[in-house]
Protein backbone atom coordinates (compact mmCIF):
# COMPACT_ATOMS: atom_id res chain seq x y z
CA UNK A 1 0.00 0.00 0.00
CA UNK A 2 1.25 3.46 -0.76
CA UNK A 3 0.42 6.71 0.93
CA UNK A 4 -0.37 9.65 -1.31
CA UNK A 5 -0.06 13.21 -0.13
CA UNK A 6 -1.55 16.39 -1.53
CA UNK A 7 0.86 19.14 -0.60
CA UNK A 8 -0.43 21.51 -3.24
CA UNK A 9 -4.07 22.02 -4.15
CA UNK A 10 -6.95 19.88 -2.99
CA UNK A 11 -9.07 20.15 0.11
CA UNK A 12 -9.14 18.45 3.48
CA UNK A 13 -10.71 15.01 3.66
CA UNK A 14 -14.14 15.13 5.32
CA UNK A 15 -13.17 12.49 7.87
CA UNK A 16 -10.07 14.46 8.88
CA UNK A 17 -11.97 17.75 9.06
CA UNK A 18 -14.71 16.27 11.27
CA UNK A 19 -12.18 14.61 13.53
CA UNK A 20 -10.30 17.89 13.95
CA UNK A 21 -13.51 19.75 14.84
CA UNK A 22 -14.38 17.18 17.50
CA UNK A 23 -10.90 17.28 19.02
CA UNK A 24 -10.63 21.08 18.94
CA UNK A 25 -14.05 21.70 20.54
CA UNK A 26 -13.56 22.67 24.22
CA UNK A 27 -17.11 21.57 25.02
CA UNK A 28 -16.18 17.93 24.40
CA UNK A 29 -12.88 17.83 26.29
CA UNK A 30 -14.36 15.35 28.74
CA UNK A 31 -14.82 12.86 25.90
CA UNK A 32 -12.15 13.71 23.32
CA UNK A 33 -9.38 16.31 23.59
CA UNK A 34 -5.86 17.22 22.56
CA UNK A 35 -2.94 15.37 24.10
CA UNK A 36 -0.40 16.93 26.45
CA UNK A 37 1.89 18.19 23.64
CA UNK A 38 -0.96 19.17 21.26
CA UNK A 39 0.40 16.78 18.61
CA UNK A 40 -2.04 13.96 19.40
CA UNK A 41 -5.59 13.49 20.64
CA UNK A 42 -7.08 11.24 23.33
CA UNK A 43 -10.50 9.60 23.44
CA UNK A 44 -11.08 9.66 27.21
CA UNK A 45 -14.52 8.05 27.16
CA UNK A 46 -15.02 5.70 24.19
CA UNK A 47 -18.54 4.79 25.27
CA UNK A 48 -19.77 8.39 25.45
CA UNK A 49 -17.86 9.17 22.26
CA UNK A 50 -19.62 6.41 20.34
CA UNK A 51 -23.03 7.31 21.81
CA UNK A 52 -22.96 11.10 21.34
CA UNK A 53 -20.22 12.44 19.05
CA UNK A 54 -20.00 9.74 16.39
CA UNK A 55 -23.72 9.86 15.48
CA UNK A 56 -23.55 13.66 15.37
CA UNK A 57 -20.68 13.77 12.85
CA UNK A 58 -20.85 10.43 11.05
CA UNK A 59 -23.49 7.98 9.92
CA UNK A 60 -22.62 5.36 12.52
CA UNK A 61 -21.86 4.95 16.22
CA UNK A 62 -19.23 2.22 15.97
CA UNK A 63 -16.01 3.11 17.74
CA UNK A 64 -14.15 0.24 16.07
CA UNK A 65 -15.02 1.62 12.64
CA UNK A 66 -13.71 5.04 13.69
CA UNK A 67 -10.41 3.49 14.78
CA UNK A 68 -10.10 1.62 11.47
CA UNK A 69 -10.63 4.87 9.56
CA UNK A 70 -7.92 6.53 11.62
CA UNK A 71 -5.57 3.73 10.68
CA UNK A 72 -6.55 4.14 7.01
CA UNK A 73 -5.60 7.84 7.12
CA UNK A 74 -2.23 7.10 8.64
CA UNK A 75 -2.91 7.77 12.32
CA UNK A 76 -1.04 5.59 14.79
CA UNK A 77 -1.79 4.68 18.36
CA UNK A 78 0.65 6.37 20.73
CA UNK A 79 -0.16 4.82 24.12
CA UNK A 80 -1.18 1.15 24.30
CA UNK A 81 -3.00 1.73 27.61
CA UNK A 82 -5.38 4.41 26.34
CA UNK A 83 -6.96 5.64 23.14
CA UNK A 84 -4.38 8.22 22.05
CA UNK A 85 -3.68 8.72 18.34
CA UNK A 86 -1.22 10.93 16.46
CA UNK A 87 -0.30 12.02 12.93
CA UNK A 88 2.59 14.20 11.83
CA UNK A 89 0.19 16.61 10.11
CA UNK A 90 -2.53 16.57 12.77
CA UNK A 91 -1.40 19.40 15.07
CA UNK A 92 -3.29 21.86 17.20
CA UNK A 93 -3.81 25.17 15.40
CA UNK A 94 -2.09 23.94 12.21
CA UNK A 95 -5.17 23.50 10.07
CA UNK A 96 -3.24 24.17 6.86
CA UNK A 97 -1.47 20.83 7.35
CA UNK A 98 -4.68 18.81 7.40
CA UNK A 99 -4.78 18.56 3.59
CA UNK A 100 -1.67 16.40 3.78
CA UNK A 101 -3.61 13.72 5.64
CA UNK A 102 -5.08 11.55 2.89
CA UNK A 103 -6.50 8.09 2.67
CA UNK A 104 -4.05 5.34 1.89
CA UNK A 105 -4.94 3.46 -1.30
CA UNK A 106 -3.35 0.85 -3.59
CA UNK A 107 -2.00 1.77 -7.03
CA UNK A 108 -3.97 1.03 -10.23
CA UNK A 109 -1.20 -0.73 -12.21
CA UNK A 110 -0.49 -4.44 -12.19
CA UNK A 111 3.21 -3.82 -11.63
CA UNK A 112 2.48 -1.93 -8.50
CA UNK A 113 0.18 -4.66 -7.29
CA UNK A 114 2.90 -7.24 -7.89
CA UNK A 115 5.45 -5.07 -6.16
CA UNK A 116 3.13 -4.69 -3.19
CA UNK A 117 2.47 -8.42 -3.09
CA UNK A 118 6.18 -9.31 -3.31
CA UNK A 119 9.30 -7.78 -1.85
CA UNK A 120 9.22 -7.15 1.86
CA UNK A 121 5.54 -7.92 2.12
CA UNK A 122 4.63 -4.45 3.34
CA UNK A 123 1.00 -4.92 2.39
CA UNK A 124 0.74 -8.07 4.47
CA UNK A 125 2.28 -6.32 7.46
CA UNK A 126 -0.17 -3.43 7.09
CA UNK A 127 -3.09 -5.84 6.93
CA UNK A 128 -1.79 -7.66 9.99
CA UNK A 129 -1.52 -4.32 11.76
CA UNK A 130 -5.13 -3.56 10.95
CA UNK A 131 -6.21 -6.91 12.34
CA UNK A 132 -4.22 -6.40 15.52
CA UNK A 133 -5.70 -2.93 15.95
CA UNK A 134 -9.20 -4.23 15.52
CA UNK A 135 -8.56 -7.09 17.93
CA UNK A 136 -7.32 -4.64 20.54
CA UNK A 137 -10.43 -2.52 20.08
CA UNK A 138 -12.68 -5.54 20.49
CA UNK A 139 -10.79 -6.69 23.60
CA UNK A 140 -11.17 -3.28 25.23
CA UNK A 141 -14.83 -3.16 24.37
CA UNK A 142 -15.35 -6.58 25.93
CA UNK A 143 -13.52 -5.49 29.09
CA UNK A 144 -15.65 -2.35 29.30
CA UNK A 145 -18.85 -4.32 28.84
CA UNK A 146 -17.85 -6.77 31.56
CA UNK A 147 -17.13 -3.91 33.95
CA UNK A 148 -20.50 -2.35 33.22
CA UNK A 149 -22.15 -5.72 33.69
CA UNK A 150 -20.63 -6.09 37.17
CA UNK A 151 -21.81 -2.61 38.11
CA UNK A 152 -25.32 -3.35 36.88
CA UNK A 153 -25.39 -6.64 38.77
CA UNK A 154 -24.38 -4.83 41.96
CA UNK A 155 -27.15 -2.27 41.54
CA UNK A 156 -29.69 -5.02 40.83
CA UNK A 157 -28.63 -6.91 43.97
CA UNK A 158 -29.01 -3.75 46.07
CA UNK A 159 -32.47 -3.10 44.62
CA UNK A 160 -33.48 -6.71 45.30
CA UNK A 161 -32.45 -6.36 48.95
CA UNK A 162 -34.54 -3.21 49.27
CA UNK A 163 -37.52 -4.97 47.70
CA UNK A 164 -37.21 -7.87 50.14
CA UNK A 165 -37.06 -5.47 53.08
CA UNK A 166 -40.11 -3.63 51.78
CA UNK A 167 -42.04 -6.88 51.48
CA UNK A 168 -40.96 -8.07 54.93
CA UNK A 169 -42.47 -5.11 56.80
CA UNK A 170 -46.09 -5.63 55.63
CA UNK A 171 -45.77 -9.32 56.46
CA UNK A 172 -44.65 -8.48 59.99
CA UNK A 173 -47.55 -6.05 60.42
CA UNK A 174 -50.01 -8.64 59.11
CA UNK A 175 -48.67 -11.28 61.49
CA UNK A 176 -49.06 -8.87 64.40
CA UNK A 177 -52.66 -8.06 63.42
CA UNK A 178 -53.49 -11.75 63.16
CA UNK A 179 -52.05 -12.28 66.62
CA UNK A 180 -54.11 -9.42 68.04
CA UNK A 181 -57.29 -10.77 66.45
CA UNK A 182 -56.62 -14.22 67.86
CA UNK A 183 -55.78 -12.92 71.34
CA UNK A 184 -57.17 -9.43 72.08
CA UNK A 185 -55.28 -9.39 75.38
CA UNK A 186 -52.01 -8.99 73.50
CA UNK A 187 -52.70 -5.37 72.69
CA UNK A 188 -53.91 -4.69 76.23
CA UNK A 189 -50.75 -6.20 77.69
CA UNK A 190 -48.63 -4.03 75.45
CA UNK A 191 -50.53 -0.92 76.54
CA UNK A 192 -50.27 -1.90 80.22
CA UNK A 193 -46.57 -2.47 79.86
CA UNK A 194 -46.11 0.96 78.33
CA UNK A 195 -48.15 2.54 81.14
CA UNK A 196 -46.10 0.67 83.76
CA UNK A 197 -42.87 1.87 82.24
CA UNK A 198 -44.16 5.44 82.16
CA UNK A 199 -45.27 5.25 85.82
CA UNK A 200 -41.90 3.85 86.88
CA UNK A 201 -40.15 6.65 85.07
CA UNK A 202 -42.35 9.26 86.79
CA UNK A 203 -41.70 7.63 90.17
CA UNK A 204 -37.97 7.80 89.63
CA UNK A 205 -38.21 11.47 88.72
CA UNK A 206 -40.32 12.15 91.83
CA UNK A 207 -37.84 10.34 94.08
CA UNK A 208 -35.00 12.42 92.74
CA UNK A 209 -37.06 15.56 93.31
CA UNK A 210 -37.77 14.65 96.95
CA UNK A 211 -34.14 13.89 97.62
CA UNK A 212 -33.10 17.40 96.75
CA UNK A 213 -36.07 19.07 98.48
CA UNK A 214 -35.20 20.88 101.71
CA UNK A 215 -36.79 19.36 104.86
CA UNK A 216 -39.49 21.37 106.56
CA UNK A 217 -38.92 22.54 110.13
CA UNK A 218 -41.81 20.99 112.04
CA UNK A 219 -42.44 20.52 115.71
CA UNK A 220 -44.90 17.71 116.25
CA UNK A 221 -46.41 16.11 119.34
CA UNK A 222 -43.43 13.83 119.85
CA UNK A 223 -41.31 16.70 121.17
CA UNK A 224 -40.12 16.46 124.77
CA UNK A 225 -39.84 19.30 127.25
CA UNK A 226 -38.11 19.73 130.54
CA UNK A 227 -39.13 22.08 133.28
CA UNK A 228 -36.58 24.44 134.80
CA UNK A 229 -38.28 26.35 137.53
CA UNK A 230 -40.89 28.54 135.95
CA UNK A 231 -39.92 27.81 132.29
CA UNK A 232 -40.56 24.95 129.90
CA UNK A 233 -37.53 24.27 127.65
CA UNK A 234 -38.01 22.31 124.46
CA UNK A 235 -35.15 19.83 124.31
CA UNK A 236 -35.73 17.84 121.10
CA UNK A 237 -38.26 16.75 118.57
CA UNK A 238 -38.62 13.34 117.02
CA UNK A 239 -37.21 14.54 113.72
CA UNK A 240 -34.21 16.27 115.30
CA UNK A 241 -35.46 19.84 114.99
CA UNK A 242 -36.31 22.38 117.69
CA UNK A 243 -38.86 25.10 118.13
CA UNK A 244 -37.68 28.39 116.69
CA UNK A 245 -34.88 26.83 114.74
CA UNK A 246 -32.71 23.76 114.42
CA UNK A 247 -29.39 22.71 115.86
CA UNK A 248 -27.90 22.66 119.34
CA UNK A 249 -27.76 26.47 119.62
CA UNK A 250 -31.52 26.74 119.18
CA UNK A 251 -32.09 23.90 121.69
CA UNK A 252 -30.00 25.64 124.32
CA UNK A 253 -31.48 29.10 123.80
CA UNK A 254 -35.18 28.52 123.04
CA UNK A 255 -37.55 28.82 126.02
CA UNK A 256 -41.29 28.60 125.87
CA UNK A 257 -43.35 30.98 127.97
CA UNK A 258 -47.18 30.89 127.90
CA UNK A 259 -48.80 33.82 126.15
CA UNK A 260 -50.98 34.64 129.17
CA UNK A 261 -47.90 35.05 131.41
CA UNK A 262 -45.80 37.45 129.33
CA UNK A 263 -46.98 40.13 126.95
CA UNK A 264 -45.45 40.94 123.60
CA UNK A 265 -42.77 43.15 125.22
CA UNK A 266 -41.56 40.34 127.48
CA UNK A 267 -42.99 41.76 130.74
CA UNK A 268 -44.66 39.60 133.35
CA UNK A 269 -48.44 39.76 133.34
CA UNK A 270 -49.25 37.51 136.28
CA UNK A 271 -50.53 34.57 134.28
CA UNK A 272 -50.38 30.93 135.22
CA UNK A 273 -46.94 30.54 133.81
CA UNK A 274 -45.35 32.37 136.74
CA UNK A 275 -47.74 31.52 139.54
CA UNK A 276 -44.93 30.80 142.01
CA UNK A 277 -43.01 34.00 141.35
CA UNK A 278 -42.59 36.36 144.37
CA UNK A 279 -42.89 40.07 143.71
CA UNK A 280 -41.15 42.39 146.14
CA UNK A 281 -42.92 45.73 145.98
CA UNK A 282 -40.30 47.45 148.09
CA UNK A 283 -37.50 46.89 145.67
CA UNK A 284 -36.89 49.66 143.22
CA UNK A 285 -35.51 47.58 140.32
CA UNK A 286 -37.45 45.89 137.57
CA UNK A 287 -38.31 42.24 137.84
CA UNK A 288 -36.08 39.62 136.29
CA UNK A 289 -36.38 39.33 132.47
CA UNK A 290 -38.64 36.47 131.63
CA UNK A 291 -36.33 35.06 128.90
CA UNK A 292 -32.87 33.70 129.58
CA UNK A 293 -30.02 35.74 128.20
CA UNK A 294 -27.71 33.69 126.06
CA UNK A 295 -24.22 34.81 125.23
CA UNK A 296 -24.43 35.21 121.48
CA UNK A 297 -21.23 37.09 121.00
CA UNK A 298 -22.60 40.65 121.13
Curated annotation (Swiss-Prot):
GO terms for biological process: cellular response to heat; regulation of transcription by RNA polymerase II. Residues 105-128 are annotated as: Disordered. InterPro entries: HSF_DNA-bd, WH-like_DNA-bd_sf, WH_DNA-bd_sf. One of its GO terms (molecular function) is DNA-binding transcription factor activity. PROSITE patterns: HSF_DOMAIN. Pfam families: HSF_DNA-bind. A motif (Nuclear localization signal) lies at residues 213-216. Keywords: DNA-binding, Nucleus, Phosphoprotein, Stress response, Transcription, Transcription regulation. Exhibits temperature-dependent phosphorylation. It comes from the Eukaryota. Residues 145-181 are annotated as: Hydrophobic repeat HR-A/B. One of its GO terms (cellular component) is nucleus. It is found in: Nucleus. The hydrophobic-rich region (HR-A/B) corresponds to the oligomerization domain. Belongs to the HSF family. Class C subfamily. Homotrimer. Transcriptional regulator that specifically binds DNA of heat shock promoter elements (HSE). This is Heat stress transcription factor C-2a. It comes from Oryza sativa subsp. japonica (Rice). The gene is HSFC2A.
